[in-house]
Every structure is written in C-alpha cells, then in structure tokens.
Amino acid sequence: MAEAKTNGQTELVFLMDVSEPMADFASDIIAGFNGMIARLREERTDILVTTWQFADFCLYVDERVPITADSVHMEQDFFERLRIMREQVARQAAPAPITLEDGKPGRRVLINAIGGVVCRARYVYKHYPETPARTMFVIITGGADNASLYYWTPDRLRDLVERQEKEAGWEFILLGANIDAAQVV
C-alpha cells in the first residue's frame, strides 16, 4: 500500500454531546470551546475543524473547515435554540408507538456517534489525495451511552479506536462532565 501524502495540517474532530442534560453545562462548554478555538487561531492557522453533535442522533455541523473561518464557534444561546427546536419538532412529529425508552431526557448514542464519526474520517481520508499530518478527536459528553442500538458495541468501538491510534497515529481525548471515563466506553 502506498504511503499517504500529508498536507502538514492538523484536523480537530469535535464530537459534542448536545443531549438535554448537557444544557446544565452550556456556559462552560461554549466558553471552553470558543476559548480553545481562539487560542488555537492565535497559535496556528493550519488547522481544520470538523464538528459533530449527538444526542439521540448524530449530525455534522462543519466538516474540514479552516480554523480561521467565522463559522468555527458556538453561539452563546446555542443550547436554548436547540431546546426550542426540539420542542417544535416534538409538536410537529406524527404519533409513533411509545416504548419504555421514549421521552427520557438525556438519551445518548455515544458509542454509535464515535464509531460513525471515526469511520467517516477514515472514508474521507481514503478519498482525499492528502490527509492531515495529525488527527485528534475531542469527545465532549456528560454521560455514558444509553441509546446505541446498532452496529457498535463497546468492544468493537474500543478495537476501532485502538487500531486507529496504532496504525494512523490518531489521538482521542474525552472531556466529560460528572462521569468516570473508564465507564463511558
């Protein structure tokens, strides 16, 4: 297999828990994220930022955006706007069968989110001619997974993360609120 070309850049991949309980930490999360981005902007401009958010679903916000772009920040009212959006969607949603898990605040698909985002990054790097010289995943969560139902299990995810650390040199950082990191994954 040919050695991948690097572009000398660093890619920061943020995976942020936006489940309802995280709203209790909103000001700390927003200030911490924006502060870190501001410090990194002063130090270097060769950083790409990818931001994903998850609760009971996972979606990307920005993908491979230069750190100098104005879109790389969190608005102060982010969690409040998210709460309002959830309420609007809940009112408009068609009735569905109710299960014991429905309606419980704080549902997190942490394992599915991490596994999916790591696989997405692998796919992107495979199809881009140049990959970042350094890739760092920053996972911000307030609790352990309690909603992943699909492909990923803790053991499969651990194997994937360890393989990427060993083979590709990727780094993974878990920033948690009120959790024991060993119990998360």
Identify the function of each model-found stretch:
Residues 1-184:
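Acidic, low-complexity intrinsically disordered regions
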